[in-house]
């Protein structure tokens, strides 16, 4: 068994794992000696046709504990028994999957997808479609991968937007609460008084309503002075005797 290729693997969210070594016995692997691959999708290996597999089978090794932990988390759980991790490397596609062993002694193997044969089938289907009134074509695997990558990117953007809104609202809430409590203290209204909590809630609800447009869009930035001025105006109304 010879070392065929050493990879770094971008697994998403800015995380890159190191020293993914692919070892095999192939005479011609058609893999670079070194490269940077990128995870693009997860697949069910049971649905991977035999013609998509090349003859070469690689065994993965690594001296990195982080790399081992990644594959253990992604491939060794019971629910991931048939999961394959698809990675793109210089317009080639690799599939990482686990070999059936005990969790304490696991082994990760890798194959290169044979897309040449897939494209040959697609060409034959295209030619046959000229005879059929309703042509049937199966999509290229790279098109499927591209769609999955786009879906993942859109999901990441939605999560990022949600986090941005939550942070914006949390900062506003902290500032508003601080201004309201300070305003109540300046007016000599103690927490033990009957109207203390009622005034606080009314003021907080009113200031949220006043800045509802900014809170729904997380923009533009709301300054401390804006919040304090609005709170003072509201407290003058709510504490007027």
From Swiss-Prot:
User: Which branch of life, at top level?
Assistant: Eukaryota
A cellular component annotation (GO) from this entry: spindle pole
What main location does UniProt list? nucleus
InterPro entries, A to Z: Sld7_C, Sld7_N
Q: Where is this gene product found?
A: Nucleus; Cytoplasm, Cytoskeleton, Spindle pole
Biological process (GO) annotations held by this record are: DNA replication
What the entry lists under Pfam families is as follows:
Sld7_C, Sld7_N
Q: Which UniProt keywords apply?
A: Cell cycle, Cytoplasm, Cytoskeleton, DNA replication, Nucleus
Q: Which family does it belong to?
A: Belongs to the SLD7 family.
What's this chain's function?
Required for the proper initiation of DNA replication. Required for mitochondrial morphology.
Q: What is this protein called?
A: Mitochondrial morphogenesis protein SLD7
């Amino acid at each position: 068994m010879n070392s065929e290729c050493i990879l770094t693997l971008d697994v998403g969210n800015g995380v890159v794992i190191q020293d993914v070594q692919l070892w095999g016995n192939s005479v011609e692997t058609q893999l670079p000696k070194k490269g940077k691959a990128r995870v693009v999708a997860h697949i069910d290996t049971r649905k991977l046709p035999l013609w998509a597999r090349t003859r070469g089978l690689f065994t993965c090794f690594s001296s990195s504990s982080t790399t081992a932990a990644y594959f253990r988390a992604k491939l060794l759980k019971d629910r991931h028994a048939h999961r394959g991790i698809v990675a793109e490397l210089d317009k080639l596609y690799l599939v990482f999957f686990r070999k059936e062993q005990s969790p304490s002694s696991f082994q990760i193997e890798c194959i290169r997808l044979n897309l040449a044969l897939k494209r040959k089938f697609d060409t034959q289907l295209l030619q046959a479609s000229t005879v059929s009134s309703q042509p049937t074509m199966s999509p290229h695997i790279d098109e499927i991968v591209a769609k999955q990558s786009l879906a993942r990117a859109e999901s990441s953007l939605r999560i990022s937007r949600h986090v941005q809104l939550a942070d914006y609202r949390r900062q506003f809430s902290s500032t508003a609460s601080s201004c309201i409590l300070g305003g109540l203290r300046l007016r000599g209204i103690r927490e033990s008084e009957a109207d203390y909590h009622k005034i606080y809630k009314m003021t907080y609800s009113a200031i949220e309503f006043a800045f509802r447009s900014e809170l729904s869009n997380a923009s533009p930035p709301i300054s401390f002075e804006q919040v304090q001025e609005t709170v003072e105006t509201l407290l003058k109304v709510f504490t007027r005797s």
